[in-house]
Amino acid sequence: MFGLKVKDAQKDDQKSSEYLSGEAGSQAGGSTQGTSTTTQRRGSSNENKVKVLQVAMKKKSDSEDNGQIELETNNLANAPIKRGSNNNQQVQLKADDFGTTSSSESGQSGTQGSTPSNPGPWTPWLTTEQIHNDPAKFAASILILYDAPYARNRTAIDRVDHLDPKVMTANYPPSWRTPKWNHHGLWDWKARDVLLQTTGFFNPRRHPEWFDGGQTVADNEKTGFDVDNSENTKQGFQKEADSDKSAPIALPFEAYFANIGNLTWFGQALLVFGICLS
């Protein structure tokens, strides 16, 4: 009773191109141009006017894709942020874009007079130099507890590596040397997250002894999936001699890590902060 009444789609041969009524449109050479106009909302006051973005479309000939309409040009890329360089296509954030949202936080960060409506400029509360001055406080070690099917008790525990904050941030560009935006696109609210801003730290290729002999072949020749199976089920990496048998791989949990930050617990991997197991 209520709702949309759906009918079969029908083509109207008399309407080869359309544009919104009320807009100043020009139709020439098989193209339709919708110019930039303004629309008023809730009265006639100037502050309620909304600018309409310009979009140009053209209709292909009947021999091209059944005469479909394609987008020719638009100016959506120029809106809504216009600060920057290179024809306003590159946005450059300033310190004023980030700030405290309450007066209590502003007193701690050294920004006086900040309000939710007028936040003060953002300043890092922990710099890389402060981390370097006290490496024992911010250093971390990683302990891994994983299933080892070839071990006697099927369990292995190992220390993978030690996170040295000075080494981790040594090759960072200057804009990454504070707990701000890291190169994973994550915001570092905690200082210890800086320790996990590494590229390739959890890369299983750094420890080839974790894998069996079939891993080398799989990295270069096989995908690990049965491409002939419509369900694309995982078959595991196998040697040529055992290709007729199912041989799923049991990997330590480090192998499933990517270049991820902000991790404290993942699977059965435990990150222990403030402990040096050298």
From Swiss-Prot:
The set of disulfide-linked cysteines is none
Where is the sequence biased in composition, kind Basic and acidic residues? Answer: 1-16
- In this chain, composition skew of type Low complexity spans 33-45, 99-117
Region (Disordered) residue ranges read: 1-86, 98-126
Q: Which family does it belong to?
A: Belongs to the adhesin P1 family.
Q: What is this protein called?
A: Uncharacterized protein MPN_412
The organism is Mycoplasma pneumoniae (strain ATCC 29342 / M129 / Subtype 1) (Mycoplasmoides pneumoniae)
Give the classification, highest ranks: Bacteria, Bacillati, Mycoplasmatota, Mycoplasmoidales, Mycoplasmoidaceae
